[in-house]
Amino acid sequence: YMQFYTNVSILKNDVYYRGVDENGKRVQKKIPYQPHLFIPVKEKTKFKTLDGRYVEKIRQETIYEAKDFIQKYKDVEGFDIFGNETFIYQFLGDMYPNNINWNKDKIVIWALDIEVASERGFPDPADASEEVQCITVADKSGYKMVFGLGEFKTEDKTIQYIQCKNERELLEQFLEFWIELKPDVVTGWNTSLFDIPYLYRRIAYLFSEPKARQLSPWGYVQEKSVMKYGKKNFAYNLLGISSLDYLDLYKKFTYTSQEKYTLGHISYVEGVGEKINYSEYDNLHTLYKENFQKFIEYNIKDVELVMQLEEKMG
């Protein structure tokens, strides 16, 4: 095996490293990192800048110290500091001086989709006031783990269904599974602005912030606000997990403009399949109340469509 990383983040003075080692085993470690910088010198050295000036390598004790050093001299005339100030790249350059050979089979990728009560219109992650009724996660082999609040029957061997007696149990069961799973990558459709913030804020609301932070393998979550359609949205970076939102990726890497970017429309346009039609019911909430079986099938199908898009788009 060649070792490779799946996620590297910097927090304070440490590098939070997740990856696969040379034995093919998964590793997760916190590494205190000492970055280096280059300062110009008069005499000849073995390091030169792109424009031919000689520089000397100075190692900093900590990331804080390096940032402090840069800050201190940034306005000093004639004192230029060189080096890779984005210390993540410097760390990766030190750790992997040659090419990295990723083994895709060793990267744990899960697609996620949640359904939330919608009796009072479309649920808003900002207040996360409606209950989570169903969560489906699927891996790239097609295996699906489904957590729901009612009875669901299936002959499908690729589906494991966990029936929960209430929402608190559903979220606890899901969290336990998630912690054991330790995903490297989470994907889905609009997951970065809906599913992940909703789950985070709902768990924090029903239990506590520390419990919600367990969504990150490091127990650390960064909140940021994103303006979209003139409205403030919350997004959460779950430290240690890379988030690949297929809605964002699709907009970024396809060159055709679509009339709408719903999962149903894009799946249809790309020819991977169609969402489950529940037009015989007024809305999703009625479907949930009157035909729970179909409600769960609808949720599972959404996750399958995301995985099929992933396969098609690569």
Which role fits each region the language model picked out?
Residues 251:
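Periplasmic solute-binding protein
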Residues 1-247, 255-314:
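The two-metal-ion catalytic cores of nucleic-acid processing enzymes
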